Amino acid sequence: MPYWRLSSFYFSYFALLGAIIPFWTLYLSDLGFDPLEIGALAAIMMGTKIVSPYLLGWLADKSRRPMRVIRWSAFLSFIFFLGIFLSSGFYYVAVIIASFTFFWNAIIGQFESVTLTQLGKHYSQYGKVRAWGSIGFIVAVLILGWLFNTIAIR
């Protein structure tokens, strides 16, 4: 994979995180969730980081097709994320968030492996490739922060 394909993945992945993470609790509060429920939903998001990278990493190793696992994880996380707009009940949102983040949190570890494999002996370029993720996060937070300050979140 060329430098820009790897870099664009990191930019996009972390831009999406920048669109979700800083504003997620505000969105949940706007939906009427109380602080305990918001904390529980945030814990679910973080809890899937403990399990999903290992399970889907195992699957990628067994299949020897890590990009297929990454693509399917991205697709399924997108489908589950769309479910957040269908209902606002706590248990429904908890299941949707658990499903979304199960697949989403598994992507980055697999892509790190793909990146290092693709860079091969040029592994010293990793920092430059990965920096695009930080740029994507910052750009998303700044643009959406301004946008949400101008218009309503919902």
What do the predicted segments below correspond to?
Residues 68-82:
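Structural signature of the two symmetry-related core transmembrane helices
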Residues 137-154:
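Transmembrane alpha-helix termini and helix-breaking/packing motifs in multi-pass membrane transporters
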Residues 1-49:
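Helix-loop boundary and gating motifs at the non-cytosolic
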Residues 115-126:
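Paired intracellular helix-loop junctions of major facilitator superfamily
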Residues 28-29, 59-60, 131, 147-151:
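Interfacial helix-cap and linker-helix signal at transmembrane-aqueous boundaries
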Residues 51-65, 148-149:
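Helix-to-loop junctions at the C-terminal end of transmembrane segments
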Residues 46-54, 137-138, 142:
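Residue-level signature of mid-helix packing/kink "hotspots" within the transmembrane helices
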Residues 11, 80-109, 114:
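Hydrophobic core of transmembrane alpha-helices in multi-pass small-molecule transporters
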